[in-house]
Amino acid sequence: LSARRLSTRKVPVLFEAPLACGLLGSFVQAASGGSLYRKASFLVDGLDKPLFAPHVSIDEDPYLPRGIGSGAFDEEGVRGSRREVVSGGVLRGYFLSSYSARKLGMTSTGNAGGAYNLELRSTQTRPDDDFEAMLRKLGTGLLVTELIGQGINYVTGDYSRGASGFWVRNGEIADPVEEITI
């Protein structure tokens, strides 16, 4: 409904929660041991290198009370641990099973079966920030409500997907936008 296109630009972006979960899933795929030992990830040799903006950290907590992914052990019986996977935007750890860890000459992180209870944190937001607070902090930028296609290349790290959403101006939704590429 009267959606407009945007010219090419670099702006802050806020993804709706379900889309942010999908992006986090793509990160886990790229940082998984299977992708790494097959050399099918752009994160090979990525430890201790910047990956995200400096305000982003990602924690894993397999012991989170009542967490959907909580458990004392992974699918191989290896005890997991609470850890920072990304700290200040820097990649600090991979998601390794016993098998993938051996193939890489590393130690299992207790991630046979995947990641457990990931928490994305940002120094630019607070845990009690609601949607409106996040829009205010975004200021002027793009709120993405839909992603189209599967334009993710895990080997190179290239990411190109169609998107639509809303242009945000001064912390308020201003205009619908469509036919944009991220």
Question: What does each of the following model-derived ranges do?
Answer:
Residues L1-F27, A31:
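Internal alpha/beta scaffold segment
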Residues L6, A30-A31, V44-I182:
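Dual-mode signal for accessory low-complexity, basic/Gly-rich regions
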Residues A31-S41:
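Mature, solvent-exposed C-terminal subdomains and processed small-chain segments of exported/organellar
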